[in-house]
């Protein structure tokens, strides 16, 4: 690994920085994945393995201490010392100041316009609609591997464009079933719906025409 690579996260390529992304280490010894990526892997994707060696990690410790090793800490249940907080969902230990300033912010259901907070995503979505006439995408909320604070909000015209074509960041729109007129998060979701709820023609199959679906056999 080059010196430049060692200064950036193995997954997102953002630099390690005490206030934003700190190094994490597991019992395997690898420390090249940042706190945000590890938190996303473990709490949202439910992937508890090391991104480098794939070893399953019961716990991960995030620290801005230079050269910190897993063996430097003694774990007593959910405690490794007064300076750290245990995040139960991800089974990660964070320094208290970092957990308050960054981790809690990522999980907060906070309006990006008026800064009011709500109890859950449903209430936040209702708040945007009622107070700001803006939309959150339910398909993205249910399927996108993102923290609540990373979910986008849209003006009505932009929301329709988001559904049909996607966003300027290169993300695709949500494809619509031509029979049900219902949208799905991505092409995989649409394909699974078509295969489960609609019909193929055995004559088309024999002719080598694949992935052609019909509303019914009439």
Segments from the language model and where they lie:
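General zinc-binding finger modules coordinated by cysteine/histidine
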Residues: 85-218
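Cys/His-coordinated zinc-finger cores
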Residues: 32-47, 128
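Short, non-ligating residues that shape and space the ligands of small metal-coordination modules
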Residues: 18-22, 35, 43, 59-60, ...
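Ubiquitin/ubiquitin-like proteostasis machinery centered on ERAD and p97/Cdc48
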Residues: 59-102
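Short cysteine-rich clusters marking metal-coordination/redox-active sites
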Residues: 9-12, 25-26, 34, 50-53, ...
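Cytosolic, low-complexity regulatory segments enriched in Ser/Pro/Gly with interspersed Lys/Arg
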Residues: 55-57
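Proximal pre-RING flanking segment of RING-type E3 ubiquitin ligases
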Residues: 1-26
């Amino acid at each position: 690994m080059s010196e430049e690579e060692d200064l950036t996260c193995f997954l997102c390529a953002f630099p390690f920085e005490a206030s934003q992304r700190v190094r994490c280490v597991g019992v395997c010894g690898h420390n090249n994945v940042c706190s945000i990526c590890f938190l996303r892997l473990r709490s949202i994707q439910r992937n508890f393995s090391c991104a480098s060696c794939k070893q399953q990690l019961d716990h991960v410790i995030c620290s801005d201490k230079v050269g910190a090793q897993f063996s430097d800490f003694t774990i007593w249940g959910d405690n490794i010392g007064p300076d750290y907080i245990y995040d139960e969902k991800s089974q990660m230990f964070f320094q208290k100041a970092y957990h308050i300033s960054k981790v809690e912010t990522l999980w907060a259901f906070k309006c990006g316009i008026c800064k009011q907070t709500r109890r859950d995503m449903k209430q936040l979505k209702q708040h945007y609609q009622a107070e700001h006439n803006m939309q959150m995408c339910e398909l993205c909320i249910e399927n996108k591997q993102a923290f609540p604070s990373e979910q986008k909000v849209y003006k009505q015209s932009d929301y329709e464009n988001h559904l049909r074509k996607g966003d300027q960041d290169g993300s695709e729109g949500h494809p619509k079933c031509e029979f049900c007129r219902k949208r799905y998060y991505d092409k995989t979701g649409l394909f699974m719906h078509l295969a489960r709820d609609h019909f193929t023609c055995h004559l088309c199959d024999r002719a080598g025409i694949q992935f052609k679906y019909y509303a019914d056999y009439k």
